[in-house]
């Protein structure tokens, strides 16, 4: 048996409690002598003075933890590794390979029937048709939680300005999320309070197949979140 943590911010402790769930899982694995590996983990930070951080560090240096790789924080990860108790490495995020993975599934009859997904086809831009930009909004407090002094109202103005910029450059657009309920709540807030056209908004992105098939139709992506940008890279779609 093997316990695998894959490609997620499970070390986060500043304003999320992932670290505690991770530590408890490691303790259970240690109790039952099950090896643990972490793959492509996001490393938020390291703080000697934080009890939460040191709680996580103590758990990570358990004998059952064999290997940890990170997608973005090798130097921070090294600080968690006391006496080289586990192997470490820098790797790409798994989403880099999303185009390869979903090219094998999107369009297959079983996927289409089960989820009602339109098979991804090569984009053909008809003469006179505008190129479309996917604009991925982030939850209202996403900036504040990450120590950026940016209110909900300022965030709304940001996205309204992005929309106007895209329109002024003669692009079509859609407002979309990668599935986080907080992002969808903020999208609803924009519709109700800032007259954002509901027909320009995409909800219920609850499966990776749905997200991939939707993004395959975009000619560009604007996103504050990590994974829409990484998926865009995988699909060779320009993104900012």
Region locations from a protein language model:
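Active-site anion-handling motifs in enzyme catalytic cores
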Residues: 1-240
